[in-house]
UniProtKB/Swiss-Prot annotation:
Keywords: ATP synthesis, ATP-binding, Cell inner membrane, Cell membrane, CF(1), Hydrogen ion transport, Ion transport, Membrane, Nucleotide-binding, Translocase, Transport. InterPro entries: Alt_ATP_synth_F1_asu, ATP_synth_asu-like_sf, ATP_synth_asu_C, ATP_synth_asu_C_sf, ATP_synth_F1_a_nt-bd_dom, ATP_synth_F1_asu, ATPase_a/bsu_AS, ATPase_F1/V1/A1_a/bsu_N. NCBIfam families: alt_F1F0_F1_al (TIGR03324), atpA (TIGR00962), PRK13343.1 (NF009884). It comes from Psychromonas ingrahamii (strain DSM 17664 / CCUG 51855 / 37). This is ATP synthase subunit alpha 1. Belongs to the ATPase alpha/beta chains family. The gene is atpA1.
Length: 519
């Protein structure tokens, strides 16, 4: 038998064997038809058994989420190039809910809300997926917030402390430095063993590119995931982005890690949900927002928590950002988020215009649970700082009318101006705990009161530099201690006196009691 005959015989034998073992398998597919398509949404008919929130597959590898499930039609939020679809196109059920890839392979990557890479580092390496919408941790699985999250910003760490597992709202008018505070907080986690997730919702591509460049230049991208929903993307992307980012952060939390997530910003998220709801003809409410706008944010932010040790003790800290209009923090969405979160950091455009950066309005900012997590040594040196600063602001306003003040009031104003000047901090320059404590002790001891305002920044830098020359035994004792001993405190005071001596000038060289705040 020739080789050709052997090949033919073998092929026929294999065919005969397969005929005896082959069993036809039928797979049922439920197919619907697009009735209409508009900006980011579609109406679909013919899917009688579809479930709410189920993922539907359209032609061209476009997906959507079933939002409105009515008797005759389904309102679908589209997650892709909706302009490629038209009436009459087929729609197929997938039988699953929207999920996203999770895992350590996502760190250092830039992805979209569907988990697709937006950078040039190749495909995402991850074998695990989690649903985008997940229930928050049960109450009995949660632990109290007891560990501080250091932001590296004096004004926050000392006066408005944040704890790991807390939800702290950052709000203010546009261009007041909200994103800067969040990014500086991420930069300060480089040695804190905290993983970070930055979720850009409806942001300009140029602004996101600038943020990514800062993270990359400072080495923060190594422990950070960036999820981007661009402003020109369909509103469905902006809607699911924070939920998808939270699922990724929850994966790390459930592995016992401490995670920080930034939502930048939830104003765009609320507007995207309002747009989708109006397109799907859901009844509008106040400011045309749907009635469940509070619920979509509460179920998102309730996922931030601190887990008990029996659940590996991880934590998820949320920093949602929201934009106000004309300093109106009593608008609908801001009041909703203030009531949901554990405190807020308000950025004042007035302070921003005066060059006081970060422009945190201490009087209108609060942290409801972070104070319990703040390191005791902070409380010891900054306990009266907020009250002193509030008294200063009141007296300064009074002094602008030309009123004559007694010596005690003049001393309060002199000290208050130094506090305000010290709370200024350049962008991308987080401070260590030792540097902050040293500056705060010098403030409370009024060692800066004879330093001219124009030299405050230079004097503070010299004081921070002096802390690097402290001996190793002091640093070891400082890092392990909860409360600063009297000897160590006196040592810091002595160093501050020596360091600040060259910058001091007579009190009458100040800028005057009734002058406006210095830049």
């Amino acid at each position: 038998m020739t080789d050709l005959q052997q090949v033919v015989a073998h092929s026929f034998a294999a065919l005969a064997a397969s005929r005896t073992t082959f069993r036809a398998q039928l797979k049922a597919r439920e197919i619907g038809i697009i009735s209409s398509v508009s900006f980011g949404v579609a109406q679909v008919s013919g899917l009688a058994n579809v479930a709410s929130e189920e993922v539907l597959k359209f032609s061209g590898d476009i997906y959507g989420i079933a939002f409105n499930v009515d008797q005759d039609s389904i309102g679908v939020v589209l997650l892709g190039d909706y302009w490629q679809l038209q009436s009459g196109d087929e729609v197929e059920r997938t039988g699953r809910v929207m999920d996203v890839a999770v895992g350590l392979g996502l760190l250092g990557r830039v992805i979209d809300p569907l988990g697709r890479p937006l950078d040039d580092k190749g495909p995402i390496e991850s074998s695990e997926r989690l649903p985008v919408e997940r229930p928050a941790a049960p109450i009995m699985d949660r632990a109290p917030v007891t560990v501080p999250l250091q932001t590296g910003l004096k004004v926050i760490d000392a006066l408005i402390p944040i704890g790991r597992g807390q939800r702290e709202l950052i709000l203010g008018d546009r261009q007041t430095g909200k994103t800067t505070i969040a990014i500086d907080t991420i930069l300060n986690q480089h040695d804190q063993n905290v993983l970070c997730v930055y979720c850009a919702i409806g942001q300009r591509a140029s602004a996101v590119a600038k943020t990514i460049a800062i993270l990359k230049a400072k080495g923060a991208l190594d422990y950070t995931l960036v999820m981007v929903s661009e402003g020109n993307a369909p509103p469905g992307f902006a809607y699911i982005a924070p939920y998808a980012a939270t699922s990724i952060a929850e994966y790390f939390m459930e592995k016992g890690r401490d995670v920080l997530i930034v939502y930048d910003d939830l104003t765009q998220h609320a507007r995207a949900y309002r747009e989708l709801s109006l397109l799907l003809r859901r009844p509008p409410g106040r400011e045309a927002f749907p009635g469940d706008i509070f619920y979509i944010h509460s179920r998102l932010l309730e996922r931030a928590t601190c887990l008990k040790q029996r659940h590996k003790g991880g934590s998820l800290t949320a920093l949602p950002i929201i934009e106000t209009e004309a300093q109106n923090i009593s608008a609908y969405i801001p009041t909703n988020l203030i009531s949901i979160t554990d405190g807020q950091i308000y950025l004042s455009p007035t302070l921003f215009e005066l060059g006081i950066l970060p422009a945190v309005d201490v009087g209108r900012s609060v942290s409801r649970v972070g104070g319990k997590a703040q390191r005791p040594m902070y409380r010891a040196v900054a306990a009266n700082l907020k009250l002193t600063y509030a008294q200063f602001e009141e007296l300064e306003t009074f002094a602008r009318f030309g009123a004559r003040l007694d010596q005690n009031s003049q001393d309060i104003i002199t000290n208050g101006r130094r506090i305000r000047a010290s709370l200024k901090q350049p962008q991308s320059s987080p401070m260590t705990v030792l540097e902050q404590i040293t500056v705060l002790i010098a403030l409370t001891e009024k060692l800066f009161d004879t330093v001219p305002l124009l030299k405050m920044r230079e004097a503070e830098q010299a004081l921070c530099l002096a802390t690097t020359e402290l001996p190793e035994d002091f640093l070891s004792r400082f890092n392990s201690a909860k409360i600063l001993s009297d000897d160590d405190r006196n040592r810091i005071i002595d160093i501050a006196r020596i360091t600040l001596a060259p910058f001091q000038s007579p009190p009458d060289e100040d800028n005057g009691i009734t002058s406006t705040p210095s830049n």
